[in-house]
């Protein structure tokens, strides 16, 4: 448990006030102290290291600060996603909420890896965030291979046609299904739901969160800060054995406006 979770739990128990009163009342002195301590402790959660997740990392394979166009110059956008760089962050959205979009990291990563990035919601009204990983063509082609069909952000192009991958929806607050109660891991092609866990990023949260994705052989885990929301072992019953090396992409639905920074991927040691 990181300090944020410990303090947040302890403060609310100690003060014995409803959470909504603590966070919204301008006349409640404990509320001001609570918000300050939670904000400080929350920033400490973002400083978590790989060892905090009971996994041994080997080499840092890739990193991008995501704070400038130069830092993501080789990334590939599919669909009408727009990027803006400010205050050390990369904001991503679709102007006028036109269409969904997918942003591919240029590197191909090994089967076993740990990825981390930070993100913060800029539009609390609606949105949905997905990470694709271990992504290749059906015959293990690179996802950017010119022989594969063109893609423009339409969901079926990523989960039902010419690609195989895993994907996790870890923030889900769409107009048709607001504040969805679960995070989902699917194995593609086929949109096969293989695991459902507790909700990911809280739909009311406007603070920065660290996302940690770990694929260790057949074992897949995803954390929001220090909170485990996906924990599944691929037994090969869906679409054959565990997927191998492939690319990672960040997907947003058309209503979504998040900002991102500090994307990193490590390989894992052989003794995990």
Regions found by a protein language model. Name each.
Residues 186-210:
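Short, aromatic/His-centered strand-loop micro-motif at the edge of beta-sheets
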Residues 22-35:
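Bacterial N-terminal signal peptides that target proteins for export
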Residues 34-43:
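Bacterial N-terminal signal peptides
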Residues 66, 115-117, 207-216, 220-222:
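Short tryptophan-centered beta-strand motifs in secreted/extracellular beta-sheet-rich domains
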Residues 82-99:
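Short carbohydrate-recognition loop motifs
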Residues 96-183:
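Secretory/extracellular carbohydrate-interaction modules
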Residues 233-261:
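Flexible glycan-contacting loops in extracellular carbohydrate-active proteins
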Residues 49-77:
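Extracellular carbohydrate-recognition regions
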